[in-house]
Amino acid sequence: MTNFGLFVGFGAPVDGRETQAARVFGEAMAYYARLQQQGDIESFDGVLLEAHGGDLNGFMLLRGDPVKLGMVRASEDWVRLVARAEFVARGVGVVSAILDEEAQRLVSANEAMTADLR
């Protein structure tokens, strides 16, 4: 499994656009499934969070090769989907993610790089 991903976070639906938000969520899941089937991403998870007092209601985590993820992120389909999501949900954000063993490697490397600052 790859150690790189895209984190797509989102908040509550915009008032009056709840039905459209559900539709765009479904579009996103279908799009990610197509990307996986085509080999553009390795896998994806759609996550809804329980109420916690914050503004993050859920997220999608796409895993894949960083070069392929960059190509996905630059595609017209991706830009269209993010624009649609921003229209129906608050706080939509897309962030590159470093996962699993690569995250651990970076934490260890940061410890070594900052040891003299302690």
Regions found by a protein language model. Give the residues of each.
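Short S/T/G/P-rich N-terminal loop/turn motif that feeds into the first structured element of a domain
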Residues: 1-55, 64-72, 94-118
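Mid-chain, well-packed structural core segment of small domains
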Residues: 58-90
